[in-house]
Amino acid sequence: MKLTCMMIVAVLFLTAWTFVTAVPHSSNALENLYLKARHEMENPEASKLNTRDDCEPPGNFCGMIKIGPPCCSGWCFFACA
């Protein structure tokens, strides 16, 4: 019983120590990530995720034999939708 209590106290202490000694600028990194995401929501052209240069436009063949980029829309039934 004493060993179990000591183990619980040790785990709680190590968990608290991890949070106390965490990198001080980690909250700043999260804030910067939030600001970047907010900027991309306000200005969709700024987002890199909206560009898909390596995809096939609608109407191009995309059957199982073809090895190449996927359809831009994500839908393929022998031709890109």
UniProtKB/Swiss-Prot annotation:
Propeptide: 23-52
Cystine pairings recorded for this chain: 55-72, 62-76, 71-80
Keywords (A to Z) from UniProt: Calcium channel impairing toxin, Disulfide bond, Ion channel impairing toxin, Knottin, Neurotoxin, Presynaptic neurotoxin, Secreted, Signal, Toxin, Voltage-gated calcium channel impairing toxin
Molecular-function GO terms, alphabetical: calcium channel regulator activity; ion channel inhibitor activity; toxin activity
Location relative to the cell: Secreted
InterPro entries xref list: Conotoxin, Conotoxin_omega-typ_CS
GO cellular component, as recorded: extracellular region; host cell presynaptic membrane
Signal peptide: 1-22
Keyword set includes Signal: yes
Pfam families: Conotoxin (PF02950)
Record keyword Signal present: yes
Superkingdom, natural source: Eukaryota
Tissues expressing the protein: Expressed by the venom duct.
Job of this protein: Omega-conotoxins act at presynaptic membranes, they bind and block voltage-gated calcium channels (Cav).
Homology family: Belongs to the conotoxin O1 superfamily.
Domain notes: The presence of a 'disulfide through disulfide knot' structurally defines this protein as a knottin.
Protein name per Swiss-Prot or TrEMBL: Omega-conotoxin-like TxMKLT1-0223
